[in-house]
């Protein structure tokens, strides 16, 4: 309901502003416009907090709001408007964000963002495309970051065979090492797997990843592979790809996966959903993902938001 209220309120203000432009003009219009913007921001901040919505009083993000389980707000694509965008999320129903490290610098940046914003938490790890930078010293840096009170996962880590480099053997080595780190520090793991279904599963099974727990981010495989991950009690990160017309295999998998094993994600700034495909992505696009899942599941959008938030809090211990 709070998403509907937000949309209605913003559309009302848009029409009202057009009316005032014609009725007034010049400096008087500017003053009225500034007043409306202040009022709008205040009300949009309060709407998601109606009916006991808001912070849980424990500094763990806002409850009963959309939970963004995978974003990269440290990415340079956000350098021009990062603060403005992040400050606007609560007003659009986004309550909690997990910022994911893709390399050592990104992992450290994720921790800094988590320190700066109460609703942001960090995951630290090295993406398979970045493992050439890893070393024993790098693993020690990750281990130290895992001790931060706002780090809730190890990752993203895994295998990506879309490009020939880094070599598969090197990816496998550091994937296994990061799984071992997650087990050591008792944190869930964020898995990246592209065009590497069998090898990813083999390594996870060999290292008993089911005992570690985690999420397969940006899940893109068929429902048969989903069954394997369900057997390990893993969650599934579903993002903008679910809105693509050619995502038939993923849509069948999402219909098969229980709602209590799904997390909402964007992978911002990548993989924007329809109708913004190709543009920079952000958590503001999560309602499109929630709506697509709701349609496939035959439930309300709010039911998806509430279930996925509950799932994410369970996984990340928030």
Q: Across the structure, where does each feature detected by a protein language model lie?
A:
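Short hydrophobic targeting helices and cationic amphipathic motifs
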Residues: 3, 9, 13, 17-20, ...
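The N-terminal extracellular segments of secreted preproproteins, especially immediately downstream
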Residues: 28-29, 300
